[in-house]
Amino acid sequence: MCDDDVAALVVDNGSGMCKAGFAGDDAPRAVFPSIVGRPRHQGVMVGMGQKDSYVGDEAQSKRGILTLKYPIEHGIITNWDDMEKIWHHTFYNELRVAPEEHPILLTEAPLNPKANREKMTQIMFETFNSPAMYVAIQAVLSIYASGRTTGIVLDSGDGVSHTVPIYEGYALPHAILRLDLAGRDLIDYLMKILTERGYSFTTTAEREIVRDIKEKLCYVALDFEQEMATAAASTSLEKSYELPDGQVITIGNERFRCPEALFQPSFLGMESCGIHETVYNSIMKCDVDIRKDLYANTVLSGGTTMYPGIADRMQKEITALAPSTIKIKIIAPPERKYSVWIGGSILASLSTFQQMWISKQEYDESGPGIVHRKCF
């Protein structure tokens, strides 16, 4: 069934971006926004050979005349019709493959509802006729990508953050914590604090500019209060940014105030714990005998962990929370933006994994429930 000459497809569907490619590659071939757009009014797009929907970058570029929807909210698929469109676009337009010819590895959020896994399985076999498929937990793939099987992953993307303790390759569900604070909340916050400076960013197009400012200029301060004092006393932390229209804006303490919300969610008016405390709480829900292994293998994953300075700050904050004798190590691989996908690429190309796929035959015999017996 799974011959070596047929590469498996690896598709990591995030709330913000979809990453897709071939098992064995070291990076995804296609990375595009997880959005589906439909025309707001019939007949606006004259002579364009009007399509009833657009996906990804094309939807983004035509957003003026479309209604945009994100089918994945907080990491969980909520709109299956649109999700099917994204998968269709992934296979046929981005990767240009026939899904009925390749095993497909999909990723899922931690604590994904059972019904969702079944639905994913059903769509792969019934709509796309895949010969085989598998569903893996995102954080587990990230830890594989870091060359480990035990540790705790802080996976923070665009729509949601999770802390996932993993022991010998298995996620420990009772200790997984979810924090609904991630990249898109930080963009909202940066838009707000830039407005306080007198720059107005309100439209979706301007939101993309703010996303770019966030990705290029923001960083995490080691000591927030001290950094605020430095920013107030001198201009050493100021950076200028050129807007598409040529106007140049200056951004100062916003550079580190924006990601500080990860450590102090009260900045966003949220009552939840910061990411450092969430990691600690997650570890404390685990058996006392494995905690030392988790502290020593704390792996960062996802685009929202890409800020310069975040690993040092995590080290400092968790050291302050943990027992004083414990060794704490924060692992922040440079490719962590794509580590879920990379872990999937590694897993799907292992010879030992080939018997783990759910085959079409098994699906036909057992139905969608097979996913709970074979993917855990």
From Swiss-Prot:
The modification N-acetylaspartate is found at D3. Its main location: cytoplasm. PROSITE patterns: ACTINS_1, ACTINS_2, ACTINS_ACT_LIKE. Its EC number is 3.6.4.-. It is found in: Cytoplasm, Cytoskeleton. InterPro entries: Actin, Actin/actin-like_CS, Actin_CS, ATPase_NBD. The modification Methionine sulfoxide is found at M45, M48. Residues 1-2 form a propeptide. One of its GO terms (molecular function) is ATP binding. Oxidation of Met-45 to form methionine sulfoxide promotes actin filament depolymerization. Methionine sulfoxide is produced stereospecifically, but it is not known whether the (S)-S-oxide or the (R)-S-oxide is produced. Keywords: Acetylation, ATP-binding, Cytoplasm, Cytoskeleton, Hydrolase, Nucleotide-binding, Oxidation. GO terms for cellular component: cytoplasm; cytoskeleton. It catalyses: ATP + H2O = ADP + phosphate + H(+). It is an enzyme of class 3 (hydrolase). Belongs to the actin family. There are at least 4 actin isoforms expressed during artemia development. Actins are highly conserved proteins that are involved in various types of cell motility and are ubiquitously expressed in all eukaryotic cells. This is Actin, clone 211. It comes from Artemia sp. (Brine shrimp).
